[in-house]
Design a protein with these regions (language model features):
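Redox cofactor-anchoring modules in respiratory/redox and cofactor-processing assemblies
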Residues: 1-141, 147-154, 162-165
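Positively charged, low-complexity nucleic-acid-binding target-recognition regions
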Residues: 157
Length: 165
């Protein structure tokens, strides 16, 4: 609530493969396809739509999802730019550690997450990860660090909720 009024809209940046990139005030619940239509439509066939920004955003399954409170950006990628890379084994370069703004050890956390070791990941502070994407961005092996941490954090939270019941 701002000034006693509920949040029903927000300014959202729409960029990428759209004809007229813009900052639009969108109401909560606006369909992404309609927002892109306000920008003149697609310039190319959309290969991927990212909701929330390039570092911490999440891929939308299609353009029929809706704008929510956290939707500060919509990025549209064409097929060529949307291709995902094969993850390579960690080369232990340490760039992820240097990039982490809160001093975590992403390479170790990723190893534990990949093994499904929730307790080990939690003991190595995966819950402290702010999911900023810096580690994934600098990784020369194209490791999907951030996604792995987010999924592991979600799994730990699910386990905690289950344990409370």
């Amino acid at each position: 609530m701002i000034e006693g009024k509920p949040l029903i809209s927000r300014v959202t940046t729409i960029k990428g493969c759209v004809k007229e990139p813009a900052n639009l005030r969108l109401r909560m619940g606006t369909i992404v396809a309609d927002a892109i239509g306000e920008c003149g439509g697609y310039t190319d066939e959309a290969g991927k739509i990212v909701m929330g920004g390039c570092m911490t955003g999440l891929c939308a399954p299609n353009d029929q999802v809706v704008v929510m409170k956290g939707t500060n950006g919509i990025l549209v990628f064409n097929e060529k730019d949307a291709r995902s890379y094969e993850e390579s084994p960690c080369i232990r370069c340490g760039r992820c550690v240097e990039a982490c703004p809160i001093g975590l050890n992403p390479y170790l956390m990723k190893h534990l997450c990949d093994k499904g070791d929730l307790k080990g990941a939690e003991a190595n502070n995966v819950m402290e990860c702010i999911v900023c994407g810096s580690c994934s961005y600098v990784c020369p092996a194209k490791r999907w660090l951030t996604a792995s941490f987010k999924n592991t954090k979600d799994a730990i939270m699910r386990e905690a909720r289950r344990a409370k019941k």
